[in-house]
Amino acid sequence: MSVTRLSEPLQNILLQDLRNFYDRASRIATLSVSAIAAIKSAWTRGSPFAAATALYPTNEEGKYVIQAEGIRMEFTNYGGAVTNLWLNNSRGEEVDIVLGLDHARDYEDYPKNPYLNGAIGRYAGFMRGGRFDMDGESYQVATNAHNGSSTFNGGDRGWGRSILDIGSHTENSITFVLFDRSWNGFPGTAASCLTHTVTPYEWRVAFGVTPTKKPGPINMSQQAFFNLDGFKKKNLTGSVPVSDKTVRDHKLHLPLSGLRFETDALGLSTGDILGNPRGSEYDFWSASRRIGDVLEKPYMGICDRCQKRQYHNHNPSGAYDTIFQLGRSQPWNKEDVPAAILSSPESGISMKLYSDQEALHVHTWSQKEFPLKLKKGQGQGMVPQHGGISFEMQDWPDGLNHPEWRRESKTIWGMDGLYTAFSSYRFSVDKTEP
């Protein structure tokens, strides 16, 4: 039996035809996926951006990657959550400095998803009774906290627990898009976008929300739990138990935090704004301070509200949990003074947070409430108590129900308005050995 060999030119023609066929098939498959996604999204969420979402590729963990010099980040479109943030520490090791989950699909399956590093909206924090008044009319929204007596972070169908579409995705930027059509009972439709951008050693966050059909309350935030060591903490023997890989040895400075919002035993704002005396467990304004010094400091006396001996707050989980009012000299610019400065002597990494929002919710990770495994690049075991610390920029907590604060122009947005909020995280690394 003889075998006829094709000439090289003919082989090349056939190979090119195969490539063209493969390309056409791939485009058809992609368009089919896009069409299915668009139909599904239009049916369930009414978003015109679903088709575009299907065109943007993810990595093998189902995450979207953006990067610039000195920084690389990954996201999932479930809540627009930050899943990974890599920097090099002072030893030149790449470390992932945020809490998260290994695969994008894990976020939707996480049974107690505490809005893990996602966008928070329409309304960040607690809303007492799930009620508010607007233009002489009372509104009741869905409640999801305190046995149905309060609304937390916009409700069970808050933006941090929703699938967001992708408006655009470039090498160093990603924009998530969401159309909230009266979810959880909030009035009107909120057309919104959230853009994450990285520049050399910097992560920028920008919110833009436009109410349509009816005015409504808007108070956006972005959660991110940081551990600047990336759980790579070492000692003289080179090994540290996971339980010691916390943020206790991180140093924190909140230069603008001379005041805080008083909360009751449930964490709801009472309407009072209190001073933070120098040297108290709330004093992060006078100087940089080791976080563990506050976590380990006993509260000297009996709390007036709960009549129990407390050491710094009313969070039953034992996590640090305080909302600070940011005091700025007028006129001010968000670039003038950072709202927070976090640093780790261990990794040599420092972070400065700048924002145009006027309240800062600081809380440490509560392993008791939300058991969470370390990501595979961070080691073995569970995230320990105080294993991370989050800084949520927002407006004054539950300002809707405290008219004495006169925050209507900051919390109620009409159809002729555009709500915006900007934050930036700037990183630096001390190259000397810690």
Curated annotation (Swiss-Prot):
Induction info: Expression is positively regulated by the fusarielin biosynthesis cluster-specific transcription factor FSL7, probably via its binding at the 5'-CGGNNNCCG-3' motif present in the promoter of all the cluster genes.
Family annotation (SUPFAM superfamilies): Galactose mutarotase-like
Binding site for substrate: 125-126
Alphabetized InterPro entries for the sequence: Aldose_1/G6P_1-epimerase (IPR008183), Gal_mutarotase_sf_dom (IPR011013), GH-type_carb-bd (IPR014718)
Top EC class for this record: isomerase
GO biological process: galactose catabolic process via UDP-galactose, Leloir pathway; glucose metabolic process
Gene Ontology terms for molecular function: aldose 1-epimerase activity; carbohydrate binding
Domain of life the protein comes from: Eukaryota
Catalytic residue list: 392 (proton acceptor)
Protein role: Epimerase; part of the gene cluster that mediates the biosynthesis of fusarielins F, G and H, decaketide compounds with 5 methylations and a decaline core that act as mycoestrogens as they stimulate growth of MCF-7 breast cancer cells. The initial compound in the pathway is produced by the reducing polyketide synthase FSL1. FSL1 lacks an active enoyl reductase (ER) domain and biosynthesis of fusarielins relies on the trans-acting enoyl reductase FSL5, before it is released through hydrolysis catalyzed by the thioesterase FSL2.
Protein name as it appears in the record: Epimerase FSL3
Gene name of this polypeptide: FSL3
